[in-house]
C-alpha cells in the first residue's frame, strides 16, 4: 500500500520540470554558525558570501545550490535595537549596508562556479511597523487577539499581520514584487518560510455566516502566487520549508518541494534518520536542507 501511494504521489503530486519529477539538489549555505549576537544570516556580507563560494571551489566541493537564508533584508542586523531575522519580516528590500549592490554580485559568483542561487523569504508574515505593513495596510489581516502564538514569539517583539493572499489585488501585487526581485537579483530558486499560526487570522476575518471562507480564498491565492512564479521562471524550484514540514499536503507538494522537512533538524542526526524512515513511507521526495 505504501509503495502504491508513493507511486501516486510521484506521478500526480510532484512538481515536474521538463516532464520529469524534480530531483532535489545538493545544497550548502553561507551561514556564519550563529555566533552571538548574530542569528541566522544577519551578520553575512557580500564579501563573506563570495569568499565562501571561492572556498568551496578551492576544495572542489562546489554544490548544486548555494542557499542564502533569513536575515539579508533591511533592519534584520540591527541587534542594538533587539532586531533579528524573525522580527523584521515585511521589510523586503536588501540591506544596503551589508549588500551595497544588492544580491546580484553573490548570484554572479555562484553562477560562475556553475551552481544555482536560492534565497529565503517569508512574505506572508508581516511585522507590525514594517515597510509592507505601513505601505499596504489594506492588505493586512489582523488576528485581533485570536492568533495562537508559539513560545519563541511571546517576547512582545513579534506582533504581526498575515498578508492577505485571499485579496486578488494583493496577491497580484506580491506575485509581481517577488518575481521582479528574483529577476533583478539573479535568483534561481525561491525558498518560502511560514512561521505563523494562520487560523486565528483567518477566523477573525471571515465574512458573517461564511465560516472558513477567508482560509479558502487565502489558500487559493497562495497556489496562484506559486503558479505565477513557476510560469514566469521555467525551471524554478519553490522550496516550501514552512517552519519545516508544515506544507507537505498533496496540493502544496504538487507546486513546491519540501527541501527542509522539519526545524527539528538542527544538530540531531538520529532524529534525521527517524524522519527519513517515517516520511519515506509516504513521500518519495523530501529533504533535510
Residues covered by each model-derived region:
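Conserved beta-strand positions
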Residues: 68, 192-194, 240
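N-terminal/domain-start segments enriched in small and hydrophobic, helix-friendly residues
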Residues: 177-220
